[in-house]
Structure formats: structure tokens, C-alpha cells
């Protein structure tokens, strides 16, 4: 049920925020297709966007460049809009190996994937909210430009139930099977249903805590009620309910039959081409694989790798863009591209990499040519589909500036009064010894240091040198996976070590108020890692500390250094002037280390409270906040097994308590991974 957006915040817009909000809203109301918000680190860009959403009351999609930042934004938006639908849409693969063929070694690699069920449920919840409500904010990663089920077919497949409706039990069960729900009278879990006499219990695929009970009298729906799937306790009775398919890729039977005929036609044409070119092995391989898939589709309605036939299943022509999350966003929706200088190039690069891999599969007879149309959006298709857009970045790229016509909305003043770091340029000759002395000063007063180098070798050597001199130092590099990277950053904030050395990873979105010094070695080596944008982003990591300082080691000042220093000075002067006019004393940010990770804690508690007031709610003290993501995943699996065991033994009180703890652990796990 849609409600108006209601912003929940103890703060009012201040600094540059009111002017930025006014200009963005005016631009949107005047029909501007592209606007850029240049917001410095710590200026409250997310709060500004939340105010724009609340004032204009428009459904919004926020694109983030990676899962880490998406989780951070999801948590912040949840806090700003607790009464509205804030959803999370990222890739649901914990592990994904696409099918590929390496001709040089004649090696075929089968597709292998591990799906995270909780994120799959959140994706289904996101599309349901976009179809049903207007008060929706979906925080998505670049996963949003990949093919998703056709929204028209998805809507056609929905099962609407209303009290008083004439429908027999078999018809309901048949429709549930078409929606890919499985009957399971023993273990009642997401995406299943069970039958007891004239009562059908259905656990919706997009829900994690509420199930539907359908009570029939002869061939009439007598009662619909929502209940807690663990305790069986009725939460409410309702007049109607819509059951959505278990997956985005569900297709009506008649469409599958039609698609199979089209696949057979393409197979015949492709076989002819391969035989004419004397490719007998490829022809045999393609025929065998495709006919097996056709048999599976005929018997079960789906097959492994069915996404490779998505063009036929959605009725598209060759080369047409696939349906994506953008097709679920209303025409008057709003798109916010966070860290746009990274996100926009990412979107542009997805199509070509995917295409190169699939062309090899088609050439060697592993797939039909139509598999090339199972792909992410091309950049020009993304541009055509995108609604009115706000690009958000501290260092907007040329694309965003060009699209906005050079009219940039500035948000340089921080409400906290924090100034941009003081920048010093020092000679390269003594950079390592000078850095060691600076590190010791910072470590003595419990502050942290980030050091960025140009090469992996130099980062390793520097780490070794600092360790030999007794400093607590860690090295962050590209071989470290996302989960471990989060752990290292958390340990730095907790004071497990004082110095973090990296190359190109200490940039966008890293929120570390404890860092008071950023050292950039070889800053005068002009190039990608020492461009104006890279320097500003790296310097910005010290902008959340009241003693923030950046040291650029270089023997000359390059054009990029001059621009970065000039821009930082401009922002610093503007902030200083604002502080003097309003009598503000800069204050450091005391952000708890668990804030980002515990993004769903309060929501989980609220959900639990509504279900059974007599039950004790699991307190945060009982949830191990400092667990690593790998340990969290193991703990979740253990608790799920224990919860089901309690439920089967009819020990509902114990099962419910474990379920409440699982809510917190799952939210922690999403943020951490």
C-alpha cells in the first residue's frame, strides 16, 4: 500500500544543502534530463537526495558502483524512510562462473553459481514494491542493467486471490506450480506451499517473515489470512492478496511452446551454416545441447541456462535490448547515480566483455546465435531508458559535466564545519623517512594513516620497511576479496593497526573518520593513478577528521596536482567563510564502527515486535557484531537448521527467538558482503 514519502531525521538541511535541494528540485520540475551534484566528502549528499525524494514524492532508483556502497546507501535510506519501501537490488550470486570456452586448450567451462537466497528474496521484494507502490527507493548496483524477466509477462503470471472468489483447489495448485512454487508438506519455506484439507498455506517468494493461508469452502475462497510461518500465529485477515512468481524468469506455457518452435527454426538454420562450413563437430554439439534443452523445456517449463533463450521467451527481435530493472521503474521515476565518475564508465564496459565470451560459445557450437541477446544493456540503451537523472560525485566525470551542460550544483559546505585537509607538497628524496616520522606522530595520538603508492611492488616494500621499524601496518591490494577488504578497513577503524598501504583502493566511499593523514607517494608522476580526480578522491579520505592533512610527495607540481590543490583550497576557503559567518567550530565525526554493518538492526527488531508481544526480542548484545562475514554465513546456516528443528518439534517460542536473531545476522551479512 503506497504512502507519501516521510523523511525521518533529527537534522534540518544546513550549509549548502538548502540551496542544493532547491536547485535540484527546480531542475527536475523544469524537466531537465541531467543534473550533477558536486558534493564533497562529508557534506551530506545522501541527506540532500533524501530531501529531494521526500519533497517531489517520486519513485527513485539509486545506482551505486559496488555492493559495499550499495549496502551503505541502503542502510542510510532505511533510516531516512523507515515507513516507506526502501529496497535492495544487487547480484544474488555469492559465487558466479559463467560458461566459457577456451579454444587454445579445447576447454569448456560449465556455468557454476551459488545463489544467496536472502538477496534473491530482496530482489523479488524490490520488483514487487516497484509494481505496487509509488513510495519506493531501490538501491541497486550495476546488476540493474542485466537482463531480468519481462515485466509484462511477470504481471500476467500473477495469481490474484480475493475473499468470495470462485476457484477450486486444483486450479490454485496448478497456478502455483506455473509460478514455480513447489509443494512441500514437511518443510515450509520460501517459495513453497502445503495443503491440509481445504486449507492451502503459501510462503511468498518475496517475503521472509509472513505467509498466506487460503481457506476454501467447496469452490469458494472463504478466508485469507497472513500468519507467522514459524509459530502459525495469525497476524491479520485480509480481503485480497496477490501472489507473485517465484522467479523473475517465469514464462506462461503458451509463450514457452511458441519459443520452442522459434528455437527449432534457428537451430535448423544454424546447422545448415555449420555444415556448409564443414564444422561437423560444432554442428553435432549444438544439436545435442539444444535438443536436450528443448526436451527439458517441454517437460518442466524451464531448463538449465534458459536465460540463453530469453530473446524468444520475451518475444524480442534480434538485437533488441533485454528487459531490465529499468523497465519496472515508472515513467516519472528518478535515477540517482552515486559516485558517477566510477559508475558511468562501469555501465559502459559491461556489454563488450559479455559479448566477447559469448561470441566464442556461438562460434564453436555451444550456443545458438540468439544467446548473444542475453546480455547487459549497451551504454546508448541505458541512456535511452534512464529517466531524469542526478549524478552525484565529489569529482564528476566529463560525461556528467557535458550532459548537465556545465551547470553543476555545488555542495561544498559541510554542516559539521569540517574543513578540507591541509595540503603540503614535500620532496620525493626523503619521502619514506619523512612518512615514518609523520606516522609515529599520528599513532601516538591514536589517529590513523592511509598511504597510497604507484605500484604493487612499492606497496609491498613500504609495508615491509614500516613493519621492520615497529609500525603496525597492513597492505590492501586487488587480490584481497571484498569481504576481507571490509574486515581490514574495520580493523583499521578499531585501532588493530595504524597504517593502511594501498594503490588504487583507498578512494570512493570509504568512510573512516579516524584517518587524519593521507600520504600520496610519487604524486608528481602524471597518469591515471595521479589524475586530478584520483588525487581529489584520495585527499578526501582525510576530510572527515578535524586534524585532516594530506601530504603529496613530488619534486614538481604537475597540472593534475595544481588542479587538485586549487579545488581543495577553494572548498576549504568556502567552508572557512561559512564557519566564521555562522560561528561554527569544526567537529570531528564520531561514527560507530558497526553503524554501516548493522544497517537493518532496528528494522528487524520492529518487525519482530509486531508479531508476538509476549515473546522476548533478541537484544543486540546477543548478536556478535564483530564477527567476520564468513563466520556470519556459517552462523546463519547453523541457526537456520536449529530454527527448523525447533519448529518441527513444535517449540515455537525458541524457534521465534532464533528467527529474530537471524534477522539481525542476515542484515549484517548483506552489508559485509
From Swiss-Prot:
It comes from the Bacteria. GO terms for cellular component: cytoplasm; excinuclease repair complex. Residues 608-627 are annotated as: Disordered. Residues 633-668 form the UVR domain. One of its GO terms (molecular function) is excinuclease ABC activity. A motif (Beta-hairpin) lies at residues 92-115. SUPFAM superfamilies: C-terminal UvrC-binding domain of UvrB, P-loop containing nucleoside triphosphate hydrolases. Gene3D superfamilies: P-loop containing nucleotide triphosphate hydrolases (3.40.50.300), UVR domain (4.10.860.10). Keywords: ATP-binding, Cytoplasm, DNA damage, DNA excision, DNA repair, Excision nuclease, Helicase, Hydrolase, Nucleotide-binding, SOS response. One of its GO terms (biological process) is SOS response. PROSITE patterns: HELICASE_ATP_BIND_1 (PS51192), HELICASE_CTER (PS51194), UVR (PS50151). Transmembrane segments: none annotated. Its main location: cytoplasm. InterPro entries: Helicase/UvrB_N, Helicase_ATP-bd, Helicase_C-like, P-loop_NTPase, UVR_dom, UVR_dom_sf, UvrB, UvrB_inter. It is found in: Cytoplasm. The UvrABC repair system catalyzes the recognition and processing of DNA lesions. A damage recognition complex composed of 2 UvrA and 2 UvrB subunits scans DNA for abnormalities. Upon binding of the UvrA(2)B(2) complex to a putative damaged site, the DNA wraps around one UvrB monomer. DNA wrap is dependent on ATP binding by UvrB and probably causes local melting of the DNA helix, facilitating insertion of UvrB beta-hairpin between the DNA strands. Then UvrB probes one DNA strand for the presence of a lesion. Forms a heterotetramer with UvrA during the search for lesions. Interacts with UvrC in an incision complex. Belongs to the UvrB family. The beta-hairpin motif is involved in DNA binding. This is UvrABC system protein B.
Amino acid at each position: 500500500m503506497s504512502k507519501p514519502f516521510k523523511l525521518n531525521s533529527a537534522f534540518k538541511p544546513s550549509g549548502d544543502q538548502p540551496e542544493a535541494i532547491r536547485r535540484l528540485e527546480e531542475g527536475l520540475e523544469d524537466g531537465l534530463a541531467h543534473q550533477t551534484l558536486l558534493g564533497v566528502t562529508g557534506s551530506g549528499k545522501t541527506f540532500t537526495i533524501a530531501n529531494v525524494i521526500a519533497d517531489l514524492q517520486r519513485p527513485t532508483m539509486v545506482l551505486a558502483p559496488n555492493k559495499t556502497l550499495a549496502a551503505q546507501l541502503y542502510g542510510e535510506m532505511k533510516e531516512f524512510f523507515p515507513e516507506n519501501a526502501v529496497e535492495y537490488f544487487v547480484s544474488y550470486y555469492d559465487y558466479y562462473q559463467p560458461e566459457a570456452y577456451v579454444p587454445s586448450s579445447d576447454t569448456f567451462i560449465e556455468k557454476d553459481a551459488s545463489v544467496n537466497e536472502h538477496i534473491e528474496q530482496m530482489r523479488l521484494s524490490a520488483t514487487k514494491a516497484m509494481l505496487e507502490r509509488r513510495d519506493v527507493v531501490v538501491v541497486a548496483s550495476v546488476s540493474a542493467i542485466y537482463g531480468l524477466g519481462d515485466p509484462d509477462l511477470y504481471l500476467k503470471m500473477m495469481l490474484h486471490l480475493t475473499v468470495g472468489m470462485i476457484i477450486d483447489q486444483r486450479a490454485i495448485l496448478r497456478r502455483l506450480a506455473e509460478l514455480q512454487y513447489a509443494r512441500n508438506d514437511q518443510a515450509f519455506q520460501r517459495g513453497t506451499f502445503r495443503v491440509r484439507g481445504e486449507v492451502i498455506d503459501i510462503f511468498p517468494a518475496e517475503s521472509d517473515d509472513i505467509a498466506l493461508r487460503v481457506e476454501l469452502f467447496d469452490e469458494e475462497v472463504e478466508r485469507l489470512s497472513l500468519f507467522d510461518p514459524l509459530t502459525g500465529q495469525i497476524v491479520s485477515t485480509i480481503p485480497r492478496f496477490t501472489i507473485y512468481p517465484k522467479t523473475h524468469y517465469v514464462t506462461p506455457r503458451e509463450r514457452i511452446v511458441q519459443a520452442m518452435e522459434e528455437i527449432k527454426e534457428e537451430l535448423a538454420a544454424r546447422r545448415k551454416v555449420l555444415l556448409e562450413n564443414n564444422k561437423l563437430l560444432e554442428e553435432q554439439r549444438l544439436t545435442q545441447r539444444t535438443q536436450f534443452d528443448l526436451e527439458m523445456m517441454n517437460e518442466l517449463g524451464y531448463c538449465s541456462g534458459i536465460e540463453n533463450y530469453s530473446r524468444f521467451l520475451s518475444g524480442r527481435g534480434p538485437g533488441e535490448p533485454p528487459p531490465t530493472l529499468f523497465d519496472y521503474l515508472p515513467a516519472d521515476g528518478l535515477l540517482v547515480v552515486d559516485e558517477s565518475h566510477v559508475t558511468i564508465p562501469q555501465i559502459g564496459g559491461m556489454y563488450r566483455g559479455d559479448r566477447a565470451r559469448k561470441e566464442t560459445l556461438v562460434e564453436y557450437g555451444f550456443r545458438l546465435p540468439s544467446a548473444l541477446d542475453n546480455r547487459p544493456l549497451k551504454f546508448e540503451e541505458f541512456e535511452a531508458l534512464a529517466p531524469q537523472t542526478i549524478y552525484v560525485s565529489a569529482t564528476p566525470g566529463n560525461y556528467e559535466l557535458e550532459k548537465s551542460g556545465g551547470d553543476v550544483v555545488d555542495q561544498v559546505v559541510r554542516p559539521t564545519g569540517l574543513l578540507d585537509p591541509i595540503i603540503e607538497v614535500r620532496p620525493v628524496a626523503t619521502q619514506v623517512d619523512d612518512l615514518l616520522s609523520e606516522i609515529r606522530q599520528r599513532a601516538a595520538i591514536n589517529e590513523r594513516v592511509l598511504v597510497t603508492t604507484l605500484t604493487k611492488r612499492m606497496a609491498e616494500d613500504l609495508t615491509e620497511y614500516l613493519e621492520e621499524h615497529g609500525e603496525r601496518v597492513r597492505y590492501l591490494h586487488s587480490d584481497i576479496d571484498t569481504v576481507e577488504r571490509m574486515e581490514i578497513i574495520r580493523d583499521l577503524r578499531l585501532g588493530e593497526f595504524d597504517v593502511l598501504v594501498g594503490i588504487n583502493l583507498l578512494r570512493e566511499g570509504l568512510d573512516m573518520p579516524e584517518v587524519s593523514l593521507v600520504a600520496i607517494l610519487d604524486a608528481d608522476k602524471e597518469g591515471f593513478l595521479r589524475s586530478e580526480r584520483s588525487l581529489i578522491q584520495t585527499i578526501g579520505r582525510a576530510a572527515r577528521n578535524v586534524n585532516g592533512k594530506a601530504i603529496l610527495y613530488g619534486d614538481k607540481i604537475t597540472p593534475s596536482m595544481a588542479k587538485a590543490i586549487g579545488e581543495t583550497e577553494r572548498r576549504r576557503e568556502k567552508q572557512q567563510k561559512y564557519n566564521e559567518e555562522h560561528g561554527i567550530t569544526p567537529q570531528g565525526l564520531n561514527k560507530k564502527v558497526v553503524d554501516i554493518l548493522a544497517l537493518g538492526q532496528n528494522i528487524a527488531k520492529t518487525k519482530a515486535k509486531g508479531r508476538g508481544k509476549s515473546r522476548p526480542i533478541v537484544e543486540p548484545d546477543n548478536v556478535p557484531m564483530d564477527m567476520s562475514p564468513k563466520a556470519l554465513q556459517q552462523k546463519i546456516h547453523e541457526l537456520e537448521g536449529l530454527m527448523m528443528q525447533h519448529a518441527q518439534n513444535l517449540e515455537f517460542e525458541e524457534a521465534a527467538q532464533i528467527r529474530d536473531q537471524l534477522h539481525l545476522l542476515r542484515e549484517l551479512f548483506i552489508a559485509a558482503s
